[in-house]
Amino acid sequence: MQSWATDGSVFFLGRSRPPLSPRAMIPAIFLMGPTASGKTELAVRLADALPIDIISVDSLLVYRHFDIGSAKPSLALRQQYPHALVDIREPDEPYSAGLFREDALHCIALARERGRIPLLVGGTGLYFRALECGIDTLPPANPALRQSLMALAETAGWPALHQRLATLDPEAAAGIAPHDRQRIQRALEIILGSGQTISGARHWQGTFPGPLYKIILRPPRSWLHQRITQRFDVMLNEGFLDEIADLSARHYAPELPAMRAVGYRQYFTWHDGLCSAAEAYQAALAATRQLAKRQDTWFKRESAHYYLDPSRDDASSLLLQMATRPRQGEVHSIGWDNG
């Protein structure tokens, strides 16, 4: 079994801080990648080889009842390989990057106290950023400006406001879908209210406790698109349409984040009789591919110690190599061609 160095030789993030206890020096591992890139499969294979506690980093998996369309690990799998921060909120209960950071830090501390490795697995880049760097300090909400944007959206439509956002802040617009009204509204509210781009107005406050290193999955696009289609077909066979009907019967507000999640949003439109099943299927696939593209764009801006191509047959063994030999300040591309 791998024994972890406790002499400070592993990679350290953040400002200098008092010496940590030996167990606090167990490095946390971030396993990050776009949707359908095989993160869960790789995580459980790693858990077969190392004393790992899996902690989910997914803004949709926190919600109960959203199971099939979110590709949530099955209950049977979670009984064998427990996943923290899954099914911890009702869909109408608020959750945020700040709350996630509090919950994740607690889970990391518990894992280290037990002498286990915290493995944080997911695709929600903002949650990873909040956990690593602290909470951002964006300007507060501006109700008057928000009301004005809502009125404009009613006449011009959210895609038009997204185009306006792309003119004012191309970087922010690239990470937001044209129909994601909540994020478009907030982005424009910040930019128009502060006169700054999102990155200019954002200031991160906080540090990560103890050592940390990051592994980013970089799948080939054609392979990922094929997996997205295959996974969606599996979801439909597993009863995704029944899940849509069940969620509709619960009468959740349509503007809730979970209700507007990729895949769900398109099939709620079908359930309401506004499109055909074939149209919903194609729209859901297209939206999922766009989500994967946005996630990949986010992770390309992240620094990491390792990059891994999950399409490789030996991806699990390569991941084990990465997880058992952290290097101070080095970057490796094991099993991934960045050329």
UniProtKB/Swiss-Prot annotation:
Chemical reaction(s) catalysed: adenosine(37) in tRNA + dimethylallyl diphosphate = N(6)-dimethylallyladenosine(37) in tRNA + diphosphate
Keyword Transferase: yes
Gene Ontology BP, a term: tRNA modification
Coiled-coil regions listed: none
EC assignment: 2.5.1.75
Residues that, per the record, bind substrate: T35, A36, S37, G38, K39, T40
Chain positions recorded as ATP binding sites: G33, P34, T35, A36, S37, G38, K39, T40
Record flagged with keyword Nucleotide-binding: yes
Keyword annotations from UniProtKB, A to Z: ATP-binding, Magnesium, Nucleotide-binding, Transferase, tRNA processing
Site, Interaction with substrate tRNA: residue positions: T124, R146
Segments of this protein annotated with the region Interaction with substrate tRNA: 58-61, 182-186
Quaternary data: Monomer.
Described purpose of this protein according to its UniProt entry: Catalyzes the transfer of a dimethylallyl group onto the adenine at position 37 in tRNAs that read codons beginning with uridine, leading to the formation of N6-(dimethylallyl)adenosine (i(6)A).
Protein name: tRNA dimethylallyltransferase
Organism the protein comes from: Acidithiobacillus ferrooxidans (strain ATCC 23270 / DSM 14882 / CIP 104768 / NCIMB 8455)
